[in-house]
């Protein structure tokens, strides 16, 4: 009996564990400390700094089953998913790694033992082929002489991509840096499947499938192209779990392995489709639920930017394929539970966040469902009008902008009809929109665009509020100067300073730079490369380069900022506890007045959730835990559980800020000494800033206490107005509102009675025009909203009639036309009111029996009403 996918994953890890490898958990799909990478797309990503010599581990051998996503960015398999046997947005990469430990001989021997060993995968040796780099004689000899593969199944691959070392069998991280040859292992599915061995004209067929790539990091490539041998060569290998499972389960498509068979069956059930492993839509959905669920689990939330937009594209592609299968209701979120069953031990983290993942997927599907049908109809209409086989970029952009159709979803629909999308035209339309947004945003120029500073400033503000320093540079109007005079604004650079430069959401310090001859008032502090710039105005004297000054921060302002920054950390931790671990920081502002925190979450917070978060933060404030700062290497910080901002680039040494066991984050800002210093934390606003992004604004310390006093004062004022006290205020206000509601109802009844009386008197004023009753009247002291009631009453009284009523309120004319049903074939209310409205500078419309309009030309009203009789007569 074949091994299951879960058993194969575990067997791989167990094998390398017996060979002295550390089993390392899969890292997040969101790469930490590598802003160049959209998603984790290979097993070596989490070891990149180790291979570069910038990080050290306690082990020299490692093995992983790494979750990977290839959708968006350089590595994008999205458009092929569902249409081929082996493309996926999500896959698991099995890998073993040597950091300066073993090299080619052991790497090849381990791979062969695992693949062919009777206690392991037990593949037929004659089914395996290998490739090596053209000049890698060492690897060739190991395969031929040590392993014993016949020469005819060992293929040398040269520079087959048009440049030196540009080869399928030569790996390089970039134009320079670590690189080296690789050897790949292929499985031969047999003669019944079309395709040739690697390097042959038929190599793109499905007969010979690559199952393992073993990279030998052997050289350091210099800018001039020379290759220098590395002192400690390393090994990086990768084997797709889904591919090796297909081989071991004797199937030709990844979608036929047990994991996908089970998922596809569930997809068919929830969409009402026929269970068919070859159905492209079933394949797409089964693949996409894996990438979507694990991306959300790792903190990505659907949005219109960056990683969030890639996730949104994948979700919407799945929803559209569900629509094709006939799914009538939301279905995608229902696949999370069955996904957990097939993932086994690899889904433990997903299991903890199952409810959150399901809710995010359901919300996203409900939002897209509102526009999906209309968007598909528009696309169908455009394709029906198409004379060629290319859909223009403007239409693709309109589908994106109006209906939320990612361009690849539009391309997906078009491909089914052998039509392509002008993606270049789409990109132009997208860039035009971005340019318009930039032009209308009013954002100023970045400080770093204004001046270039070569100096370096040492920051002492963690421990000091003032600092004796020397002026190393002065900039006025973006130019370097040696001296400034009283009244001049400038940026002053010091060799060392206690002033914190704006960073990580915390605003820059303010204060005074002074000596016996001058005083420079600092209103802001910013970074300029390695220098810290003090922005402000010289209030008196003369300040020159090389002057010695005393730099003193505004301590009261800094203290307020410190409290708000520490409260931000507590807020972040509390949100993750109350809302779920999908919450991650998306932006922040910390100043002396308040804090603002943007975070990923799929819906508005409920009032009770806001209260729970506020209570949790205040409980930690009352704990009065020490705020501890430690310097450590980044890897140690990760092990300690410190939260880092995804996409941020950190130095080798990082500052880790801890508040008891409640919060641990990487942070370079200034903070309170103890959580109790915060005093009181109050949330003053919660709102949305973009799809999937929420914002909380909060205050602390004195500001929070002041807000409590203000609320109490307001309650007391209201209590006095309604003749109550604070304790019974709610009941008193409720009684007052009930009374007001009753009076409004009574007033409306009186108005209705008045309207009925007026209607009775008006009915007698109707005249006959060609045998039809016509009533035209301008009313005084009548509210516009009463006109409709009066028309209905007059219809009942007159039986058959045309009624035109008007009134003037707030310097505006209100008109209404009513026509009884028996007359609408000749006189349509909408046409009549348009004729009258045009004469008073207005417009209107409605049904054939009732229409309303408004206008601004009061003086023209009498003549407009006089014209009604002639208009009616001409149509009878």
Swiss-Prot record:
Belongs to the class-II aminoacyl-tRNA synthetase family. One of its GO terms (cellular component) is cytosol. Gene3D superfamilies: 2.40.30.130, 3.10.310.40, 3.30.54.20, 6.10.250.550, Bira Bifunctional Protein, Domain 2 (3.30.930.10), Threonyl-trna Synthetase, Chain A, domain 2 (3.30.980.10). Catalyzes the attachment of alanine to tRNA(Ala) in a two-step reaction: alanine is first activated by ATP to form Ala-AMP and then transferred to the acceptor end of tRNA(Ala). Also edits incorrectly charged Ser-tRNA(Ala) and Gly-tRNA(Ala) via its editing domain. This is Alanine--tRNA ligase. It comes from the Bacteria. SUPFAM superfamilies: Class II aaRS and biotin synthetases, Putative anticodon-binding domain of alanyl-tRNA synthetase (AlaRS), ThrRS/AlaRS common domain, Translation proteins. Binds 1 zinc ion per subunit. The gene is alaS. GO terms for molecular function: alanine-tRNA ligase activity; aminoacyl-tRNA deacylase activity; ATP binding; tRNA binding; zinc ion binding. Its main location: cytoplasm. The keyword Nucleotidyltransferase does not apply. Pfam families: DHHA1, tRNA-synt_2c, tRNA_SAD. It catalyses: tRNA(Ala) + L-alanine + ATP = L-alanyl-tRNA(Ala) + AMP + diphosphate. It comes from Photorhabdus laumondii subsp. laumondii (strain DSM 15139 / CIP 105565 / TT01). PANTHER family: ALANINE--TRNA LIGASE, CYTOPLASMIC, ALANYL-TRNA SYNTHETASE. Its EC number is 6.1.1.7. It is an enzyme of class 6 (ligase). PROSITE patterns: AA_TRNA_LIGASE_II_ALA. Keywords: Aminoacyl-tRNA synthetase, ATP-binding, Cytoplasm, Ligase, Metal-binding, Nucleotide-binding, Protein biosynthesis, RNA-binding, tRNA-binding, Zinc. Consists of three domains; the N-terminal catalytic domain, the editing domain and the C-terminal C-Ala domain. The editing domain removes incorrectly charged amino acids, while the C-Ala domain, along with tRNA(Ala), serves as a bridge to cooperatively bring together the editing and aminoacylation centers thus stimulating deacylation of misacylated tRNAs.
């Amino acid at each position: 009996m074949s091994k299951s996918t879960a058993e194969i994953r575990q067997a791989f890890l167990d094998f390398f564990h017996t060979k002295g490898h550390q089993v390392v958990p899969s890292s997040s799909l969101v790469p930490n400390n590598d802003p160049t990478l959209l998603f984790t797309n290979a097993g070596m990503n989490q070891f990149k700094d180790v291979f570069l010599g910038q990080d050290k581990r306690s082990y020299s051998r490692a093995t992983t089953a790494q979750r990977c996503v290839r959708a968006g960015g350089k590595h994008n398999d999205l458009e092929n998913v569902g249409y081929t046997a082996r493309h996926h947005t999500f896959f698991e990469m099995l890998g073993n790694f040597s950091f300066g430990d073993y090299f080619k001989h052991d790497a090849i021997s381990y791979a062969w033992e695992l693949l062919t060993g009777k206690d392991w995968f037990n593949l037929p040796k004659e089914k395996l082929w290998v490739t090596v780099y053209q000049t890698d004689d060492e690897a060739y000899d190991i395969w031929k002489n040590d392993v014993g593969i016949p020469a005819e199944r060992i293929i040398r691959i040269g520079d087959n991509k048009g440049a030196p070392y540009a080869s399928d069998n030569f790996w390089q991280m970039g134009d320079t840096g670590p690189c080296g040859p690789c050897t790949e292992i292929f499985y031969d599915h047999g003669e019944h499947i079309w395709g040739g061995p690697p390097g042959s004209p038929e190599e793109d067929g499905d007969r010979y499938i690559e199952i393992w790539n073993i990279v030998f990091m052997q050289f350091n490539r210099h800018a001039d192209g020379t290759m220098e041998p590395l002192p400690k060569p390393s090994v990086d290998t990768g084997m797709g779990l889904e591919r090796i499972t297909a081989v071991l389960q004797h199937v030709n498509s990844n979608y036929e392995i047990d994991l996908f068979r089970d998922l596809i069956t569930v997809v068919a059930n929830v969409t009402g489709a026929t269970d068919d492993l070859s159905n492209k839509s079933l394949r797409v959905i089964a693949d996409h639920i894996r990438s979507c669920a694990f991306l959300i689990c790792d903190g990505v939330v659907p949005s219109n930017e960056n990683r969030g937009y890639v996730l949104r594209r994948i979700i919407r592609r799945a929803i559209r394929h569900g629509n094709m299968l006939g799914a009538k209701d939301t279905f995608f979120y229902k696949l999370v539970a069955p996904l957990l069953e097939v993932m086994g031990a690899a889904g433990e983290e997903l299991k903890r966040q199952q409810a959150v993942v399901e809710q995010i997927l359901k919300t996203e599907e409900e939002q897209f469902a509102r526009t999906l049908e209309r968007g598909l109809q528009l696309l169908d209409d455009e394709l029906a009008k198409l004379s060629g086989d290319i859909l223009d970029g403007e239409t693709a952009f309109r589908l994106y902008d109006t209906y939320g159709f990612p361009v690849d979803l539009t391309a997906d629909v078009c491909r089914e009809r052998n039509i392509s999308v002008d993606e270049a035209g789409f990109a132009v339309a997208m860039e035009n929109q971005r340019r318009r947004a930039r032009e209308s945003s009013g954002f100023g120029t970045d400080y770093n665009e204004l001046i270039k500073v070569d100096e370096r400033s040492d920051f002492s503000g963690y421990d000091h509020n003032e600092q004796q320093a020397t002026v190393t540079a002065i900039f006025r109007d973006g130019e370097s100067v040696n001296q400034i005079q009283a009244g001049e604004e400038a940026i002053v650079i010091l060799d060392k300073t206690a002033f914190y430069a704006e960073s990580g959401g915390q605003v820059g310090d303010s204060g005074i730079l002074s000596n016996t001859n001058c005083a420079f008032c600092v209103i802001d502090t910013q970074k300029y490369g390695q220098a810290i710039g003090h922005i402000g105005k010289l209030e008196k004297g003369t300040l020159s380069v090389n002057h010695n000054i005393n730099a003193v921060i505004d301590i009261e302002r800094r203290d307020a900022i410190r409290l708000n920054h520490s409260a931000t950390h507590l807020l972040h931790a509390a949100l993750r506890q109350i809302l779920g671990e999908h919450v991650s920081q998306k932006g922040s502002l910390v100043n002396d007045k308040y804090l603002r925190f943007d975070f990923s979450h799929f819906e508005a917070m409920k009032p009770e959730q806001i209260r729970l978060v506020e209570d949790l933060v205040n409980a930690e404030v009352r704990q009065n835990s020490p705020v501890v700062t430690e310097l450590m290497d980044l890897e140690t910080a990760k092990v300690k559980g410190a939260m880092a901002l995804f996409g941020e680039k950190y130095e080798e040494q990082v500052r880790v800020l801890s508040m008891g066991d409640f919060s641990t984050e990487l942070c370079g800002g200034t903070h309170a000494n103890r959580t109790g210093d915060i005093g009181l934390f109050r949330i003053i606003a919660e709102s949305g800033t973009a799809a999937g992004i929420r914002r909380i604004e909060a205050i602390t310390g004195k500001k929070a206490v002041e807000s409590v006093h203000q609320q109490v004062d307001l309650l007391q004022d209201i209590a006095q107005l309604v003749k109550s006290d604070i304790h019974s205020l709610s009941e008193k206000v409720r009684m007052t509102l009930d009374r007001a509601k009753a009076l409004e109802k009574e007033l409306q009844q009186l108005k209705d009675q008045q309207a009925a009386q007026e209607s009775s008197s008006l009915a007698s004023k109707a005249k006959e025009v060609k045998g039809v009753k016509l009533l035209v009247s301008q009313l005084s002291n009548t509210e516009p909203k009463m006109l409709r009631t009066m028309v209905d009453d007059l219809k009942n009284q007159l039986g058959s009639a045309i009624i035109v009523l008007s009134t003037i309120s707030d310097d505006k004319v209100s008109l209404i036309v009513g026509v009884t049903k028996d007359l609408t074939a000749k006189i349509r209310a909408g046409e009549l009111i348009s004729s009258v409205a045009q004469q008073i500078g207005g417009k209107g419309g409605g049904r054939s029996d009732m229409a309303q309009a408004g206008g601004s030309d009061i003086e023209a009203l009498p003549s407009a009403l006089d014209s009604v009789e002639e208009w009616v007569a001409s149509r009878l």
